[in-house]
Amino acid sequence: MEGDMIVVTGATGHIGNVLIRELNTRRQIVRALVLPNDDCHPLDGLEVEIIRGDVTDLKSLESAFVGADIVFHLAGIVTIMPSMKKVLERVNVGGVCNVAKACRTSGVRRLVYTSSVHAIAEPPHGTVIDESQPFDPDGVLGDYARSKARATLVLLDEVRKGGLDAIICCPTGVIGPWDYGISNIGQLILDFASGYLKSYVRGAYDFVDVRDVANGLILAAEKGQTGRHYIFSGAQVQVPELMKELERNIGYPAPTYEIPAVIARVAGVLASVYYRLIRRRPVFTAYSIDVLSSNSQVSSARAREELGFTTRPWQDSICDHVNWFRSEGMLPTRS
């Protein structure tokens, strides 16, 4: 990759800005594609050329990709809210179509696409999720996961046609610092700190550090096999464990009241409507409750063996995430 021109779409997002930070440490030439109205504060102080554009606008992509050797496509919509099917299809699926076309016409040597572990059909509990399971829009939970599954299948089809060298990376739940846009887990941390989080739902999720994902994407660009996909997972964390870790790092007691998942799911349906009305990001929805109850045994063995992917302890990631919010003056205090 040394000396290559690299383009990052979704550059102001959590993974995007951390990827650019890592590329900067390697003295790579980086161009960031950001939306016309995007706040570029996450890129402040970084060595990067900023280009305004939109993955739904093919011409803007072709302009942004001129002279590019490698494209990291991270732009997309991540949501746990319902009723967003059309915009998810337009941005997540249509965006991949446009990126693939622009890579062809611009002569991009390699495309690294960030999909999601949720795009992979979920096997029964007790079965480890790995790359042997297919990308299946009908075998995943929620409109977001379906859009990522369809987008991934579109890209794999483009690779099969020939003339496009693309690799797919599938992170689990991303945690860690530089969370400017406040991710779903970031919102949970802030709600815990403010005292807004009064209860919890038993379940589990796999978390991986954003810095390890950024490094994994670079490894995929360097070592990945064309048309192959790699899962980036870290550790399966039970919700009570997460609450205790937040208690340790933030200094306030964790909620002790456990809501049964069945009741929480019903409440989640109503919560989606409520949060939409007050224009606040939800702590939970019916979809997020389903995810916590789903299979979260995930293996990154392929990425570790073929790419050299490594991860740090999830507790360190939570600590760094909390401390970053604190250093930015974003962590609430209780009166």
What is the predicted role of each segment?
Residues 4-26:
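N-terminal Rossmann NAD(P)H-binding glycine-rich loop of SDR-like oxidoreductase domains
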Residues 38-44, 48-94, 102:
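NAD(P)H-binding glycine-rich loop region in Rossmannoid oxidoreductase-like domains
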Residues 91-144:
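Conserved Rossmann-fold NAD(P)-dependent oxidoreductase catalytic core, especially the SDR/UDP-sugar
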Residues 98, 150, 183-184, 201-221, ...:
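Substrate-positioning beta->alpha
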Residues 136-139, 187-208, 212, 224:
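A conserved pocket-lining segment of Rossmann-fold NAD(P)-dependent short-chain dehydrogenase/reductase
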Residues 141-167:
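Active-site Tyr-X1-5-Lys
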Residues 162-164, 176-187, 220-230, 252-254:
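Glycine/proline-rich active-site loop of Rossmann-fold NAD(P)-dependent oxidoreductases
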Residues 216-283, 300, 315-335:
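Mid/C-terminal beta-alpha module of Rossmann-like enzyme folds, strongest
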